[in-house]
Structure formats: C-alpha cells, structure tokens
C-alpha cells in the first residue's frame, strides 16, 4: 500500500471488496456530513465515509455499511472513530480488516481503511 503523505488535509483511503472485485473509496473532511453520498458496491451494498474537522483538526471518522434492499437500505454497521488521532509519517490502518455480512444468503463485504494527513 503506497499512499502519499504530502497531503496536509486528513484523508481516509478505503479498499472495499465484494465478490472478488475491489473498489477504492477516498474521503476527506466535509462541511456538511448530510450531503455525503454513499458509494454503490455492485448494487448489493452501500458504503459511506463521513469525516469532519474543526480548524484543520480531524474531529471524527464515521463509516456506514448498508445492505441495499427494498423498500430502503438497511444499516449493517456503523463504525465511529473520534479524535485525538496520532500524527504519523505514513498512513495507518485505522479499521483493521472488516467483514460485513448481509441479506438472506449472507453476502460478504470486506473493507479496510487507512488514515493519513494527520498533522501535529
């Protein structure tokens, strides 16, 4: 995993895998967390990352995983990470490897996210 640390803005780099296909989701802090749209994962899951910061300092990271179904998506996991975040030279694996299961046949979504750009 080669990620640049030249960015001064905090960021989260996630690798999300379903059915052998991996998508990369990149997130940075937003002013309005309600405007963050989830990322569609093979029309089976939704993956959403919300980061907020105050005066350049990261306040929290929220990661939501939903199962897509009718009449509306169902929340499977909400992961919360709160400040303080330790400054590091390289991005650090924040989430570990997460395995999420959903639906009647227990479809598996796997993700892991690295946090970087944290300034002292």
Predicted regions and their residues:
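Mitochondrial intermembrane space
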Residues: 9-120
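Sec/Tat signal peptide C-region and signal peptidase I cleavage site
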Residues: 3-8
């Amino acid at each position: 995993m080669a990620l640049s640390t030249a960015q001064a803005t905090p960021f989260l780099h996630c690798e999300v895998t379903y059915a052998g296909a991996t998508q990369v989701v990149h997130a940075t802090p937003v002013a309005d967390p309600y405007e963050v749209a989830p990322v569609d994962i093979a029309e089976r899951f939704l993956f959403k990352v919300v980061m907020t910061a105050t005066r350049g300092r990261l306040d929290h990271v929220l990661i939501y995983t939903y199962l897509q179904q009718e009449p509306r998506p169902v929340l499977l996991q909400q992961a919360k990470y709160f400040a303080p975040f330790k400054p590091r030279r390289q991005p650090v694996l924040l989430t570990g490897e997460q395995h999420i299961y959903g639906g009647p046949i227990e479809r598996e979504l796997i993700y892991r996210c690295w946090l970087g750009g944290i300034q002292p």
